[in-house]
Amino acid sequence: GKFLNGLNLDVRPGWQLSILGIFFLMAAYPLVNLSFLVNESIPLPAWADKFESQAEDTLKAILTMNTPVIFIFNLIIIAILPGIGEELIFRGILQKQIGLLFKSPVAAIWISAFIFSAIHLQFEGFLPRMALGAVLGYLYYWTGNLWVPIIAHAFNNGIQVALIYVTGMDISNFD
């Protein structure tokens, strides 16, 4: 209740702002890819490598989509629910509270992006996920509408699930 007050979730952004949010996120993909290359060059200790390997095996199992029903299910659990839930938590609540604490929207965006990435417990995707979190944070800050990063987040995850389903591509680098 208290934390969700002031999020203006009843205010829809309109299709233009939603599309603009998606385009802004897509425009940041080169930065995200660069951060992936930097992240990939950081050596991991053996325990982290093992952890990454287990996480990748789990993701491969989840993203093996043999039927349209499994594809739709994955869109719901990997795109729609995280788009809503993670944005409510990390941008709507955490970023907002950190902003109030530090009196700095930029600090709030980057601290919440760091926590967003850390919570995912994937070392090899840490920097690109943090960059995506920052982009989503800036979308929320600039528009003042939480639906914009929710839609962009769901689109980002959904397009990756759809690409894997349609192409049968290897998901080793799925973030």
Feature map (PLM): residue ranges:
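Small-polar-interrupted transmembrane alpha-helices in polytopic inner-membrane proteins
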Residues: 78, 82, 105-120
